[in-house]
């Protein structure tokens, strides 16, 4: 293995921008694998609602960090950071070109920038109390103790809201005060994918999710883990659950899911521009542009 810092390629972008399809084409060209950096695709049985790469796509190119835990067992950033770094180091040992793809800015930067992540174990009693308060009250608490985190976490994301409160109450420090601890000794190229027609893509993908069976997938998760499974607060699953309990129609669920996803995508784009500043790819031919940039980086 070379004594020089290993090269690592990163592809980031908002949800529904087409990262999965482009990443597979890039991986095929450079004969490498994909490390999926996503806070929801790590869970089993959550395929449709997380837009997980299909079985066919996963057969075409090997994807790491998918389906590594049951939805009942939340994985925090610290745990994901450790699992991902170990997997990436294994690729480097094999002289493979690590290729990281995802839209979860915090998870990605915990790996590429070496963010220090508080090693706070789950506080079951505290979590129970917070669960009883409900998401709206928990959000109010988070706005008071860690307002910066509320700009990075989706209002409906009960899991991450409780985790941020948990870190604050245990350490006395806001989760948003994470600092760079020790960036890995990698030479990193960050590419960004952002589509001009993102709203239309989100609406179309949302319709496809409901046509493809997110309601059945949600029903399966409920039957296996219970109606109050925290991860079901994820955009799309929450709306599908509301259809199942007759609190919403399918049309309303599609509209609300798309609206929330558009809002989430805006926050992702803001994060990437402020925290990452990648080389944004040409929308007309992102594959050609990516290949040119990567080959130049590797030469």
Curated annotation (Swiss-Prot):
Source organism of the structure: Prochlorococcus marinus (strain MIT 9301)
GO BP annotations listed: tRNA modification
EC number in record: 2.5.1.75
Residues under site feature: Interaction with substrate tRNA: 104
Residues holding substrate: 15-20
Annotated spans, Interaction with substrate tRNA: 38-41
Cofactor(s) required, per the database record: Mg(2+)
Subunit structure, as described in the record: Monomer.
Similarity comment text for this entry: Belongs to the IPP transferase family.
GO function term, MF aspect, one: ATP binding
Role this protein plays: Catalyzes the transfer of a dimethylallyl group onto the adenine at position 37 in tRNAs that read codons beginning with uridine, leading to the formation of N6-(dimethylallyl)adenosine (i(6)A).
EC primary class: transferase
Keyword Calcium: no
Assigned keywords, A-Z: ATP-binding, Magnesium, Nucleotide-binding, Transferase, tRNA processing
List of residues binding ATP: 13-20
Pfam families the UniProt entry points to: IPPT
Chain segments annotated as coiled-coil in the UniProt record: none
Superkingdom per UniProt: Bacteria
Record-given protein name: tRNA dimethylallyltransferase
Catalyses which reaction(s): adenosine(37) in tRNA + dimethylallyl diphosphate = N(6)-dimethylallyladenosine(37) in tRNA + diphosphate
């Amino acid at each position: 293995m070379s004594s020089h810092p290993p090269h690592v390629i990163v592809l980031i972008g908002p949800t529904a921008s087409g990262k999965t399809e482009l990443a597979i084409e890039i991986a095929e060209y450079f004969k490498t694998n994909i490390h999926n950096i996503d806070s929801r695709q790590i869970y089993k049985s959550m395929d449709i609602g997380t837009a997980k790469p299909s079985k066919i796509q996963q057969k075409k190119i090997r994807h790491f960090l998918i389906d590594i835990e049951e939805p009942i067992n939340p994985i925090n950033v610290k745990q994901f950071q450790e699992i991902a770094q170990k997997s990436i180091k294994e690729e480097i040992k094999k002289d493979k070109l690590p290729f990281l793809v995802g839209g979860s800015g915090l998870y990605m930067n915990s790996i590429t920038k070496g963010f220090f992540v508080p090693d706070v174990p789950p506080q079951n009693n505290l979590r129970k109390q917070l669960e009883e308060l409900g998401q709206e009250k928990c959000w109010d608490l988070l706005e008071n103790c860690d307002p910066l985190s509320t700009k990075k976490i989706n209002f409906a994301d009960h899991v991450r809201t409780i985790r941020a409160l948990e870190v604050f109450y245990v350490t006395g420090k806001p989760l948003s005060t994470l600092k760079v601890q020790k960036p890995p000794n990698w030479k990193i190229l960050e590419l960004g994918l952002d589509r001009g027609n993102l709203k239309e893509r989100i609406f179309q993908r949302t319709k496809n999710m409901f046509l493809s069976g997110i309601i059945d997938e949600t029903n399966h998760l409920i039957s296996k883990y219970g109606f109050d499974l925290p991860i079901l607060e994820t955009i799309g699953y929450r709306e599908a659950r509301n259809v199942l309990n007759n609190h919403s129609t399918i049309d309303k669920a599609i509209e609300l899911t798309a609206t929330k996803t558009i809002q989430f995508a805006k926050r992702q784009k803001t994060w990437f521009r402020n925290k990452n500043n990648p080389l944004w790819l040409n929308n007309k031919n992102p594959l050609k542009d990516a290949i040119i940039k990567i080959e130049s980086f590797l030469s």
